[in-house]
Amino acid sequence: GILFMFAASLTFSLMNACVKLLDSMSSMELIFFRHVFTAICIGIWWCFYPPYKTDSKPRKKGGYLRLLMRSLTGGLAMLAMFYNIATISLGTASAFAQTMPIYIVLFTLLFTKERVRLPIILATMIGFVGVICICDIRTESLGIDNIIAGIINGIMMALAYMSLKDLKEYFNESSMIMGFAITMAVVGGVFMFIEIPPLSGFSMPNVREWIGILILGILGTLGQMFLTRAFILAPAGLISPLDYMRIVWGVIFGVMLGDSLPNMMTLSGITLIIVSGVLIAMPVFLQDYKKYKNKSLKP
């Protein structure tokens, strides 16, 4: 499970690097082609393994409006992330994307009756300090638009993640991925022809861009497969902290593609976000580790 989570983190980071290389294409174009490829892959998978045959768990009827809302929030998160990847350093864009746990804790405090312990609240405050650090507008490449996109990215990813718990009662995983892919392919296909600078716009891809689109689709699909496999093989709390490797990979691949090294303020912010995320995940990590250890010791 840990190896698959590591592979998922690396694969998604490579996908983000591919997005940066395709900065000549609009974010809407990338969303359209990325999700058309995913829908085709899931469709081929369903030809061999139909969901009604492989899913033995009883499901509730309906849930389509919830699936649509989850798809739209996840799509907005991806749109904001793609925009930042194209316009700022890959490491900073990756750090914004990994602020999701901070907003989950905040929404849990504000909108649910779940009890949040003081250490988690303190970890969340550390994360917000990290966000403030990477929102340093004194850096030449980071503008107000990037800060807004980064905040939207984290908030929308948190909302999309929190909706998964309810959606599992209605759909299996492949159906949720297909619903998300179809929704975002339609949204991307429509809005790339509507003038919304700098997000929209369409130009026929050249040979290099078609190759990039193909690699983007393959990496995205592989990343989703590795991530799913990781959560099947190991408890979520045990492997979730490894997802923060995406920030490290983002900095490495960004520098390889020409980004400058993060300044001290940005590096401090990235470090605080990683520390915050690991601290937020720590109680679940320890709980799952004990269960996993006890299970492995049983004869």
Predicted regions: what is each one?
Residues 17-27, 54-56, 132-143, 194-212, ...:
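Membrane-interface helix termini and inter-helical loops of multi-pass transporters
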Residues 119-136, 265-284:
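Hydrophobic transmembrane alpha-helices of multi-pass small-molecule transport proteins
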Residues 101-122, 248-267:
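C-terminal transmembrane-helix exit sites in multi-pass transporters
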Residues 9-13, 43, 71-79, 101-106, ...:
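Hydrophobic/small/kink-forming positions within alpha-helical transmembrane segments
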